[in-house]
Amino acid sequence: MAALRVLLSCVRGPLRPPVRCPAWRPFASGANFEYIIAEKRGKNNTVGLIQLNRPKALNALCDGLIDELNQALKTFEEDPAVGAIVLTGGDKAFAAGADIKEMQNLSFQDCYSSKFLKHWDHLTQVKKPVIAAVNGYAFGGGCELAMMCDIIYAGEKAQFAQPEILIGTIPGAGGTQRLTRAVGKSLAMEMVLTGDRISAQDAKQAGLVSKICPVETLVEEAIQCAEKIASNSKIVVAMAKESVNAAFEMTLTEGSKLEKKLFYSTFATDDRKEGMTAFVEKRKANFKDQ
């Protein structure tokens, strides 16, 4: 905790007062977690909600927390009723960064041989859409974790930063890559080289955040978006997510070819037929995820 306070004091910009988040219900599967809280939400329990829950450490991302996060993600990924996932933090911090105490005494050999931080990548492999609902600090690994999600909603007082430079290192979980793709080279370079934080408003203007919400309604608005996504065909949603993500990995020509392939693939699904039939018949589609 002391190390986190030192890091927070180094990140430039005024500190914000804490805000309160709503109470949470236990995970439906009965799993016992130490560092997260997970549950199903939405009118028909179609949304998986995961809350990072290390408030005394400002949700510092220790190995145990990441392991539990991966377990909850796997459970929701395998649940046929869940169509989208919301990832959020606490009242003061989404996540203030990686756990510095776990990293302090690591050597190059330790990092290389253990593929340090490799287990963070599981979030990027989830096929169901994941929405980050960010209140408070999203610093370092917390900012990287949010950027691994497909959509970012931010509370009005949220702040984003990559302050690793201030403790003698650089982002190691995709920060230099995803931040640059999201906000462009100039702002990303400034944030990475100075450790400066940006506000939710600046993050939205730069393209990092898609929506700013009142603090009190942030999570519920993210859940509403997730419910809307979950109401569509899950198999087609997965195809759409894959196609959009390909834009960051492929050339325009390659990405367009993949898009066409996935577009054609929807014509092999019952849901495509149902969706177009429902449109012609002027009724709501009844997707079966087939």
Curated annotation (Swiss-Prot):
SUPFAM superfamilies: ClpP/crotonase. The keyword Transferase does not apply. Its EC number is 4.2.1.17, 5.3.3.8. CDD domains: crotonase-like. It catalyses: a (3S)-3-hydroxyacyl-CoA = a (2E)-enoyl-CoA + H2O; a (3E)-enoyl-CoA = a 4-saturated (2E)-enoyl-CoA; (3E)-hexenoyl-CoA = (2E)-hexenoyl-CoA; (3S)-3-hydroxybutanoyl-CoA = (2E)-butenoyl-CoA + H2O. The modification Phosphothreonine is found at T46. It is found in: Mitochondrion matrix. The modification N6-succinyllysine is found at K101, K115, K204. Changing N59S: In ECHS1D; decreases significantly enoyl-CoA hydratase activity; decreases significantly protein expression. The modification N6-acetyllysine is found at K101, K115, K118, K211. The modification Phosphoserine is found at S114. Pathway: Lipid metabolism; fatty acid beta-oxidation. The keyword Isomerase applies. GO terms for biological process: branched-chain amino acid catabolic process; fatty acid beta-oxidation. Residues 1-27 form a transit peptide. Homohexamer; dimer of trimers. PANTHER family: ENOYL-COA HYDRATASE, MITOCHONDRIAL, ENOYL-COA HYDRATASE-RELATED. Belongs to the enoyl-CoA hydratase/isomerase family. This is Enoyl-CoA hydratase, mitochondrial.
